[in-house]
Amino acid sequence: MSDRESATEPTGLALDVRDLRVRYGSNEVLKGVTFSALRGEVVALLGPNGAGKTTTIEVLEGFRMPASGDVSVLGSDPARGDERWRARVGVVLQSWRDHSRWRVRDLLDYHARFYAPYATAEVPRPWDVDELLGVVGLTAHAEQRVMRLSGGQRRRVDVAIGIVGRPELVFLDEPTAGFDPHARREFHELVHRLSDFENTTVLLTTHDLAEAEKLADRILVLDRGAIIADGSPDQLALDLATKAEVRWTVGGERHVHAVEERDPTEFVRRLLATDPDVTELEVKRASLEDTYLALVQRVESGQAEEPEKLEALS
Amino acid sequence: MITTETLGARGVAVRAGLHRGWLETKYSLTDVGDIFWMLIFPVSFTVTLLFMRGSTVPGTDLALGAMVLPSLIGMSIAFGGLAGPAMQIATDREDGTLLRAKATPDGMLGYLIGKIWFFGLTTLASLVLLAIPAVTVISDLRIDGRTALLLPVIFVVGMIATVPIGSALGSIFKSSAQSMLIMLASMLLIAISGIFYPITAMPTWLQWVGQVFPFYWLGLGTRSAMMPAGAEAAEIGDSWRTAEMFAVLGVWAVVGLVLAPIVLRRMARRQTGSAIAAAREKIMTRGY
């Protein structure tokens, strides 16, 4: 029996999460999170700090027990995932000072050894260590000790260890934290390569909208334990944008109107129908960045309202 | 379900673990800090020998230094097996080494095999270093077939009796800073275990405390392997008590082997990226 075959979901879903709830004591950090990811898809979990991104990813990695909900990762419940399942999942951890005196090549080679028994006809495991060092741009540092690496180089070691078993699904928690722009760009290319050439499903967390836009096929916006938006970057801008600005000129006089509805088309149609002298028409939709910032702000101000309501009740 | 595939994977993990132990030993031998620790026993033994010049074991004409060497060998085994893993596991938990093992298929098995092999090899290395000052008292010792047979057995039994319990202790402590307590406790136990001073010269109640822990019994075992006939007169009950020694070490081994997997599994379950981030945060702000 090929484990690859039995594991392939008929639906093509790599991830399926329904009504996931996690509690720390009496504090509910995830309040019913539901989403899924297709095979080969790059999904970004975007949200401000403390939104529950890391908790979500830790449940999916099998490192944290949820209070309730159905979680399926490559067809298995991560809480019961066996070693064979583990071999198909890549976890990119944030290195700190672990294995600091190991040489880069030794460390990667050590981790690669564990995956050889899990190779299948379709997926040769693990990656060739030297080839992978080339892919992550560490060939020149192969003999260097981990402690001598820069933050960005160390992060690339983390990525290499996370994907050395040629996983079908990779989890990346805040992958580019502390990267300089050059390292960030190289890392983005690596993620694209994983999804385009290896057909690897990628779930990453970030609080950086620009990064989510650049990397992800789909963005999930998480805030205070709930998903508040789910879609492609373009869709998200449409769904979340509440305002568009319409500017025009009539007889040398400039007019500005903020359209409160989602779709400004109707307003523009009426404007053009009623006033034939309109020139220099301009419709500006709020950028996704404006939208995200507004959303974070809205949620934060919403948080401030709650205690007031309580006061009014008592 | 255990299939041939999982058995194969376990075998690969065990081999990877041995490779890990060997690599870590190599790294350790190029690390100034580690070499310092390895030299502690040989150097302290040399100092002890200097202080003990001319002293003899009470009631015999045996050089006191000759009695200390076998005791030190026993202590090195106990120390390398107990304090080493305890401190290392606490550190590895805090810095994410264990989480990496958890994220790798059969990685925990590889990690544990690697640790046992690593502590075995480095303890052996420090024993070899101990042999250098030992030549000065070798003429007072009895090195024969019995030594060649008993010493390796005691080394292996000692490792089995201490590494699991040391690993379990290391997983109980909340931070690597707390695990330094193990170091202090070990020092105290060594002081009352008859290694630097004959246990028979201590108050009876302290003798009993000393006899609970593996330090005393490993020291006794290695003395029995190397001391000349008649030296047992300086021991409790005028005997090497070989059967009792293996019995007590056996009990420690069983306790450790039962306890360690339970405690380690419990600790490993609690390991998450955010727990490590929290530990890092704490250490960064505190500075240790």
What are these regions (language model features)?
Chain B
Residues 30-55, 65-84, 124-126, 183-193, ...:
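Hydrophobic alpha-helical transmembrane segments of multi-pass membrane transport/permease proteins
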Residues 44-48, 65-137:
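Hydrophobic alpha-helical transmembrane segments of multi-pass membrane transport proteins
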